Structure formats: C-alpha cells, structure tokens
Regions:
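Helix-coil boundary/capping segments in enzymes
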Residues: 1-243
Length: 243
C-alpha cells in the first residue's frame, strides 16, 4: 500500500467502543459508577459519566441524524456495522483506504474525563480501563499496523504520569491523548503539567490533543451556537489552537 516509497499513515483513526467497555474493564471498586455508551439509536455516541450525558448540546440533546445521513453512514460503514466495529473491521477499513499504519483515538472515551470536579481516582480508573481495552483490541486486530493513543486523566498529574508510563511501557501505546480544554482552571502551559510533558519526552511519544463537541468542559464557541455543525467547527478548531 506504500505509494512512491512512502508509507500511508492515518494519525487519527477512531474506534467505536462497545457499550459495555467500562463495565467489563474498569476496576471493580468503580464498577457501579462505570461510564457507559448509550445504544438507544443508531450512531449513538452519547456517553454517561457520573450521571452526566455527554455528547449533548447546551440546553438540548445530541440531534438525531436525518434519513439521508443515516443512509450515507449505513452504506459507508455497512461492513463494520455487520461486524460490530470489531478489530478486523478496523483493519479492513484501512485496506480499503490504502493505509499502512494507523494511530487509534477514542470516540466515547473522549468524554470520560470531560468535566471539572471529577473524582481523580475515578477518572484515572476510567482511563486505565479504556487503555486496557484498546490494548486487547489492537492485539486482536493487527498490532503491526494499528497502534494506540493512551488516555490519561489531567485531574491528577502524578496519576497521569504513571498511566502514561504504564500505557507506553506495558501496553505498547505510541502516543498520549488529551482534550485541549482547560481542566480545573489550569491551562496546558501551567507548570503543574511539566512532569507529564517530561514523562512523554522521556518515553519518546507525542501528545495528541483532540476536542469533542458536547462535553461538560468549557469550549470556545459552545455557548454561542445551537447548531451542532457550527459548534463543532468552532470548538474543534479554536480549542486545538488555544491548546
């Protein structure tokens, strides 16, 4: 699949997590609080974290897809849907797109640390569970072609450092994933995060920032637009630049 001697790499390919990921993988201490992805309609990425329904617009629910959107997505992802978005479907999608390698980012797990005042231990447990699942997912697919970006929780920097070390050293992750939003009043240039940046530098892995619309974090433009499309354009582009 290499073209003109260059490998084709997708640096941000998303997974569709199973609805019971955290129920199966989270530390038993937190099982009664486990995040869960809703499955009440097709393409449901809404995720419940500590009673908060993420992927919802201010003052309302995440809008349902139109019939045309349903058909377009259904046609495009027919094979993956039939396989339940399993690891094999991820690899087959890469084959169709002519990709040699891909770094996998989350969908539902984008929301598992996404509001202030979270219990830091719970947030860390949710990240560990996702990383453990992603490792198993990659091993069941093609670990020579698909690689993971580990989720770490900014709610407690020492545990974020520890999880980055575990995810890279023990699980083979190739990047660390963070949301670009300000957590607990601390922008990313705050010296409190220096140990995390130092750990990533020592581990020789990049940090990837990725915004999602509809979280409980303050996001640029989220309070100005009722349209999902416009809010998405604003929050994703501006938050990335601000980070």
């Amino acid at each position: 699949m290499a073209k003109h001697g260059f490998k084709m790499i997708d640096a941000e390919m998303h997974v569709m997590e199973p609805v019971d990921l955290w129920e199966r993988y989270i530390d038993p201490e937190f099982k009664d609080r486990a995040p869960r992805r809703l499955n009440e309609r097709r393409w449901d990425i809404r995720t419940v974290v500590e009673g908060q329904v993420m992927a919802s617009m201010p003052g309302g629910d995440w809008p349902a897809l139109s019939d045309a959107e349903e058909k377009a997505l259904g046609d495009r992802y027919a094979e993956a849907i039939a396989r339940g978005f399993d690891p094999e479907s991820q690899v087959r999608a890469m084959d169709k797109e002519g990709l040699d390698l891909a770094i996998l980012y989350p969908t539902s797990a984008m929301y598992i640390t996404a509001f202030d005042t979270m219990d830091p231990r719970f947030a860390e447990a949710a990240c560990r569970a996702y990383n453990d699942w992603l490792h198993d997912y990659i091993q069941a697919g093609d670990p020579g072609r698909i690689f993971g970006a580990a989720a770490v929780s900014p709610h407690d920097v020492p545990t974020a450092v520890a999880e980055a070390r575990r995810a890279v050293g023990s699980l083979g992750m190739k990047a660390v994933f963070l949301r670009p939003n300000i957590y607990n009043g601390r922008p990313w240039h705050d010296p409190a995060y220096d140990p995390l940046w130092a750990a990533c530098q020592e581990l020789d892995v990049p940090v990837g920032f990725h915004e999602t619309t509809g979280s409980r974090m303050k996001a640029a433009g989220a309070d100005r637009f009722k349209s999902l499309g416009i809010a998405h354009i604003s929050t994703h582009s501006v938050e990335q630049m601000l980070a």
